[in-house]
Swiss-Prot record:
The lineage of its organism: Eukaryota, Metazoa, Chordata, Craniata, Vertebrata. It holds the Pfam family BEN. InterPro entries: BEN_domain (IPR018379), BEND5 (IPR040391). Keywords: Coiled coil, DNA-binding, Repressor, Transcription, Transcription regulation. It comes from Xenopus laevis (African clawed frog). GO terms for molecular function: DNA binding. This is BEN domain-containing protein 5.
Length: 393
């Protein structure tokens, strides 16, 4: 078993075998008094009986082996309690002078209650002189008394430094360097966090400005599209005129909620849809009962243009990209397209008031008309194949 002891003479700690402690036979690692002063041999020669006396020491910890003891020291699990100045339980041969020592300690106190440690030797000499006058002490005991009285003062002078004796100096310096390095890293991290926070604030301001600009651009686009629709309606209110539009300059605008359509007028069993567009009254009433936006738009396109016109036209007048040698077909009349959009808007507005839903459903009008044109062309091709087959037979 090993003991971690602190010698009171020089305040140095050692890990020594427990056998070097005189008259000490522990039964476990907890069988010791940390406040008691023991007699410990510092070297093997002293223990073997060579010249040298045991020294006063304080046992701080016990362990089964030296490795466990060193681990406890490195982990700072050892505390140094204050030593008791009562040596009545210690195996020292001069414990008979304990009462005299305590009485002299009480005389070494200042008026404010603190011990006068600066001049212990003068007081010791006075005590020794008084003891010499008494015949029960011989000269051989003077040296021992001097040792007894000087040791408590020596230990009191080191009382404030007990805690520093646990951690080795190398470990302390290493921990201090690590602590200073971590402080520098923490300052650097705090600086980076502050810089990042300022950047985030600036980005948030820019994002807010960008959001307001995007909203303004959207509003301007909506107003521009409505203005285009109004102009198309005014252009189509006169005689029916097919407008010649260059395919490269024409771009069908994205649909938005349209203004309220004109009041439909019934004359000679026909219904006026606006912009000079008239349809059959009976077919118009049948169209109102149609379910689904796709079917409604396709049937309305057939009522306005007819299948013969639709099969030879396109919505935008731009050639398809699916065929390399595709020839662009003439676009449909813009004012008639606006009539289709107005009718579709009037139909959707009766079902919902959500502008987003209205805009989404209106954006599919051109798609439905394109599908109808493709269906007509497909039917015509199938009819031509059947006729060619019959002619061959």
């Amino acid at each position: 078993m090993f003991a971690f002891v602190r010698f009171l003479e020089d305040n140095v700690c050692y890990a020594l075998p427990a056998t070097r402690v005189r008259e000490f036979h522990p039964h476990s690692t907890e069988d010791f008094d940390s406040r008691r002063v023991y007699a410990v041999y510092r070297s093997l020669e002293e223990e073997a009986g060579f010249p040298g006396a045991p020294q006063q020491a304080q046992i701080l910890a016990l362990a089964e082996n030296k490795t466990d003891l060193e681990n406890r020291v490195m982990q700072k699990k050892i505390k140094i309690p204050k030593i008791s100045l009562n040596y009545s339980e210690q195996p020292w041969e001069y414990k008979d002078y304990e009462d005299e020592e305590d009485s002299e300690f009480r005389h070494f106190k200042r008026a404010d209650g603190r011990k006068q440690v600066e001049s212990p030797h003068k007081s010791i000499e006075a005590v020794v002189a008084r003891l010499e006058k008494q015949s029960f002490i011989g000269p051989s005991h003077n040296t021992r008394c001097d040792e007894v009285f000087s040791e408590p003062f020596h230990s009191v002078g080191h009382m404030d430094r007990l805690e520093a004796a646990v951690v080795p100096r190398v470990l302390y310096e290493e921990l201090l360097r690590s602590y200073q390095q971590q402080q520098q890293e923490m300052k650097h991290i705090q600086h980076e966090l502050e810089r990042t926070r300022k950047q985030l604030v600036q980005q948030a301001k820019k994002l807010k400005d960008y959001g307001s600009l995007v909203t303004e651009v959207k509003e301007l686009r909506v107003l521009n599209r409505r203005l285009q629709d109004v102009l198309l309606l005014r252009l189509g209110s006169g005689p029916t005129i097919e407008l010649q539009i260059d395919k490269s300059d024409y771009c069908d605008p994205e649909p938005e909620p349209e203004p309220e359509p004109e009041i439909q007028k019934i004359s000679n069993e026909e219904v006026h849809l606006g912009s000079g567009v008239w349809v059959n009254e009976e077919k118009w009433h049948q169209l109102q009962a149609t379910q689904g936006d796709s079917k409604y738009t396709k049937n309305l396109a057939v009522m306005i243009w007819g299948t013969d016109v639709l099969k030879n036209r396109s919505v935008t007048g731009v050639a398809t990209k699916k065929k390399k040698d595709a020839v662009p077909k003439p676009p449909l009349s813009p004012h008639k397209l606006s009539v289709v959009r107005e009718c579709m808007y009037d139909r959707i507005a009766r079902e919902t008031m959500d502008e987003n839903e209205i805009a989404q459903r209106l954006s599919k009008v051109n798609k439905y008309i394109c599908e109808k044109i493709m269906d007509i062309n497909k039917s015509c091709k199938n009819e031509e194949r059947r006729e060619a087959k019959y002619n061959v037979q």
